[in-house]
Regions:
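Short amphipathic alpha-helical segment that frequently serves as the phosphate-/nucleotide-binding helix
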Residues: 14
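Active-site region of the double-stranded beta-helix
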Residues: 7-10, 18-159, 167-175
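Short hydrophobic motif
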Residues: 1-2
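Conserved beta-strand-loop-short alpha-helix elements that form
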Residues: 162
Length: 175
């Protein structure tokens, strides 16, 4: 949905998200991708502040779950989804990615509303319900072995993409 949130400004800065990822109780991870060798690395938090400047200039993503439980402005985003029964809402996960950052092609077993906060991200989905769902066995993440996109969009701040459970998707930070 283009411009689903007109004039959207991310309620949390990358610096604040990184700070949250340093908290002992926060559920945080960094995913790094070596595109040349197609190697993936998963690092779990909590992180030390000095670990962020040591990350590469591109090809990584920071993800923090349950951000709505830490930040009232992030929690306020849930008001836009009051039409969904509360038992179907888990949390607000926030990601920050440098150019080329991705978590790989994967499938979630729950409704996902992707709201683009800062920068632009390319999203591809495979809308075929019979698409292969086998996972790679060479990585710690549950990444799809095969992914053939049927749709492709670049989301900008305020844009939203809805993904029903079981829809394969792949997002890569453009900037």
């Amino acid at each position: 949905v283009r411009n689903a949130f007109p004039g959207f400004v991310s309620p949390i800065t990358p610096e604040d998200l990184a700070g949250l990822a340093c908290e002992e109780a926060a559920l945080a991870r960094v995913v790094l991708h070596d595109r040349k060798r197609d190697r993936w690395e998963l690092r779990n938090g909590p992180f030390a502040e000095e670990s962020f400047p040591k990350l590469p200039k591109k090809d990584w993503t920071l993800l923090v779950q349950d951000v709505d439980k830490w930040d009232a402005d992030v929690a306020a985003l849930l008001e836009h989804f009051a039409f969904i029964p509360s038992w179907r809402i888990d949390d607000v996960m926030v990601s920050y990615a440098e150019r080329g950052g991705t978590v790989g092609a994967h499938v979630d077993q729950y409704d996902v509303f992707l709201i683009q906060g800062m920068g632009r991200r390319r999203w591809q989905i495979d809308a075929n319900p019979r698409a292969p769902k086998a996972f790679r066995d060479d990585v710690e993440l549950r990444l799809l072995r095969e992914f053939t996109p049927s749709h492709d969009w670049i989301l900008e701040p305020g844009d939203m993409l809805y993904l029903p459970p079981g829809i394969a998707h792949y997002g890569v930070a453009e900037d």
